[in-house]
Amino acid sequence: MKHFVFLVALVCVLCASLNPVKAVSNTELQDTSRFARIISKGDTGGGDGKYIELSTIRDNSTDAHTKNIEAKIYVVLPSSDLIREYKVRYDYDLNLSLANMVAKASKLKTRLPDFSLHELWNIKMMESGIVGMVLNQQDYTLNGESKQTQPALKGYENVTFLTPTDFDFESYHVANRVFKMVYGTFYDDVVR
């Protein structure tokens, strides 16, 4: 029996060492060799912000019409003593980039005489072209200690600081900046 208890304890220690939770503190997020701050319109200037872990950015694109990026993004909320780590995946439909839609507007104008550029805005409001999904999340204190992650309310699993990616919302601007980090241009500047 002693051997069994020892074996179980050894397995637990090995599992914990192979799959450690890597906490991140607010001080670590300031290390520009590991993290880049995502400047976005939702920042209040009160110490909050969003940071992307540079080593986690993955371009998983498989075709020319859509781009797929995965990364870890940290949202800092000082008033709640909270850093929330999100592992996210963004899917970008290049046909729905704003520049691509504007480039094709003249064709629409010839087929639909009453078509105006304002309609493009309405189309983007209905279908932004970016789909964001939270794959995992973890909470930490500002000092980098693990915190119990609060489960999302049923039906709101993908309503976060980073999703859904509705056009002209904060989450859309973050996804647009992530695209620029990978491809060197904003998503809405891509013309196919």
What label would you give each PLM region?
Residues 7-8, 182:
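Intrinsically disordered, low-complexity segments enriched in polar/charged small residues
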Residues 15-23:
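Bacterial Sec-dependent signal peptides at the C-terminal "C-region" and cleavage site
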